[in-house]
UniProtKB/Swiss-Prot annotation:
Family: Belongs to the plant COV1 protein family.
Extracellular side: 78-91
UniProt-listed PANTHER family: COV-LIKE PROTEIN 1 (PTHR31876), PROTEIN LIKE COV 2 (PTHR31876:SF26)
Keyword Transmembrane helix belongs to the record: yes
Compositional bias ranges of the Polar residues kind: 7-17
Name of the molecule in the record: Protein LIKE COV 2
Positions of region (Disordered): 1-38
UniProtKB keywords: Membrane, Transmembrane, Transmembrane helix
Residue ranges annotated as Cytoplasmic topological domain: 1-56, 113-261
Cellular component per GO, a single term: endosome
TM annotation in the entry: 57-77, 92-112
Membrane topology term: Multi-pass membrane protein
Top-level lineage group: Eukaryota
Amino acid sequence: MAEGKEATTSSLSQGLTPHQDPDDAPKSPPNSPNSSTRKACYGVLQSWVSKKFMTGFVVLFPVAVTFLITWWFIQFVDGFFSPIYENLGVDIFGLGFITSVLFTFFVGIFASSWLGSTVFWLGEQFIRRMPFVKHIYSASKQISTAISPDQNTTAFKEVAIIRHPRIGEYAFGFITSSVTLQTDHGEEELCSVYVPTNHLYIGDVFLVSSEEIIRPNLSIREGIEIIVSVGMTMPQVISHVDRTTNRTPHQHSLRVPLNRL
């Protein structure tokens, strides 16, 4: 019995410092109700401040981005004609921007005429003969014609939804043309559907049966906005449009025999 008491005493003495009394062993502070209340209030206040800050950030971020892009665009466009006015001694901010807008407007009027279209056609033929420059011009023109208000030159005819890449999954695309496939079982109408990836000039082309294409009630510009915004401008409800009423007469059709594929 005495040996057990000695062992217990030695074990307690080993856990203490030489000058520390056993009664003065460190004890954890009691968890008082006041400290718990303070912690709860601090957590609620921190959560409230964080949510309000994020709400303000979400509200101000698109406004700031819109303002910065608009300001940069105005300064960029204003820089085309501002040096001319500065040489004339006229220093009015925004005058170059207004001049650029009016210049673009009158160029559009001139390009719509027979003389203007002829002049621009000759200039285009000259650019297409220049190495390296012709590739840049061709890519940028395809993007501009995709959103052109002229229905005779619009590259994208309709917005399309196709089943891709697997059954049960869908992808947005644009119908660019149609083709008639001749087989032993008859003819099948196919549509050339361009499925872009960001950016808009990079993507894949699929030949899809016209009966399997879903034509939504979306304009070309709305479809471009959906793709450029990575789906953030997607409407909550998309309805189907009848193909017989939505097909444009300028959409040309090509007949491709099967033995040529």
